[in-house]
Amino acid sequence: MSLVRRSAIWPDFPFLFPFGSVIAAIIVASITRGRSGLKDFLSRCLRWRVGLKWYAAALLVPVALALVQVFLNVLSGAPMPTAAQLGPWFGVLLLFPDSFIDAPLGEESGWRGFALPRFSASRSPLTNTLILGALLAGWHLPLALVAPSVVAYLIGTVASAVLANWVYYNARESALLVILYHTASNTMGRYFFPMFSGADLVRMSWLFAAVYSLAAVVLILVNGPTLRRQPATQADTAQLPQPQIP
């Protein structure tokens, strides 16, 4: 996202780019439902009582997938990251706060905190997830254009949407947990991708798409079209009196 923010897009207010979706969500929620709309929006963004296992899933699944990507890249001929590149063990933790603010906080608050709950209930969570994934691919197109591989980036974006919504639906539809998932995923990308260059970097991009896609397929096969391990509770799936996305 930082590459886009340094480009000609929104040259006067580049810092607002990652917050476009949440700004739109706040405006629409205020206009359509007023205070109650904002309350519902904030409740999803701040929903933290979801069980420790889903915090672990949101934070550790991206780490595991990133390690698999690095392993496969090295196995395919890329040089092993050096000790200097890896740095101290806590170095990756220093990337987390900046990654949190740089995109996930603004994006997921808008997409999962506001937009996704208003998708049609007549479709399965998986179908809505794939629709959202396509929208997110379009949203991230400016960033994809400066990525090592445009196609790999967009495929990975859709696949990551499946993983993110798996967390979302199992964590009581908490946008907060998806924010953490997105932050962990971006942190891993910012940590490992700069360790490669040239053809190795392009291969790493395709491994990102392949590993995330494989993980998404496994989750779909295990959980089915609901993406849930257990049936959703009525409180988690209460429909909002808002216009639905067709």
Regions found by a protein language model. Give the residues of each.
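Aromatic-anchored segments of alpha-helical transmembrane domains
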Residues: 63-68, 133-143, 182-192
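Membrane-helix interface linkers and caps
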Residues: 2-57, 71-87, 167-173, 220-235
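Membrane-interface helix caps and helix-loop-helix hairpins in membrane proteins
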Residues: 7-8, 78, 142-150, 195-202
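Membrane-interface starts of transmembrane alpha-helices
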Residues: 9-20, 123-132, 174, 200-207
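C-terminal membrane module of polytopic membrane proteins
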Residues: 171-176, 180-246
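Juxtamembrane helix-entry segments on the extracytoplasmic side of multipass membrane proteins
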Residues: 81-97, 145-156, 202, 206
